[in-house]
Amino acid sequence: MMLRIPALLSPDEVRQCRQALEQAPWQDGRATAGPLAAQVKANLQLPLDSQAGQAIGNLILDKLGASALFMSATLPLKVLPPRFNRYEGGGTYGNHIDNAIFTIPGTAIKVRSDVSTTVFFSEPDEYEGGELIVEDTFGHQSVKLAAGDAIVYPGTSLHRVNPVTRGTRYASFFWTHSLVASDEKRRILFDLDQQIQQLTVRHPGDPALSALSGTYHNLLRMWSQA
């Protein structure tokens, strides 16, 4: 399932984050890539111990926790601290699938990359190219969202970032270890949850809502791996 989360960050928050990102020191993005990915990766990344990255990452995590859409779509158990990349001057990242398991820096905690997320910090008209191309069962999708928007998609998806030929593309990326590993099952739970929320508004107090809610939680109980 691919899902856009609009306005995860406010314009003021985006502006403050951009200022911090523009002033921060960057490193070659291949430093964090495996041998195969490094062959197709040409971008810059903030070091994992970057103070600016940690501060912005904490803001993103706070916003995700307050986003009912993100929580419903991803059913997070653990979220890897957000990372940050920068594309310019032809920078690109060719077709690849992300590692299945990541370790939270400074810990022994493992995070399975069930769901990938990208948060955009540059407006689409600030750069040419730079589309996130995701290929999966839902087809071939080209993603280039407004600053402050986020996109979530399965961690199993083949994806790439097209070359940025003008301007600079700033973004954050990270992975969520979901309570439900299967994308198909997460989609069923998400659709059911969204319908329950809509029916709650249209028909508050309807006894059928309790039954539907019970079905949702029984499915979650059956499928979750907490």
From Swiss-Prot:
The keyword Metal-binding applies. Fe cation binds at H96, D98, H159. Binds 1 Fe(2+) ion per subunit. It is an enzyme of class 1 (oxidoreductase). Its cofactor is Fe(2+); L-ascorbate. Its EC number is 1.14.11.-. InterPro entries: Oxoglu/Fe-dep_dioxygenase_dom, PKHD_C, PKHD_hydroxylase, Pro_4_hyd_alph, Pro_4_hyd_alph_FE2OG_OXY. This is PKHD-type hydroxylase Daci_1172.
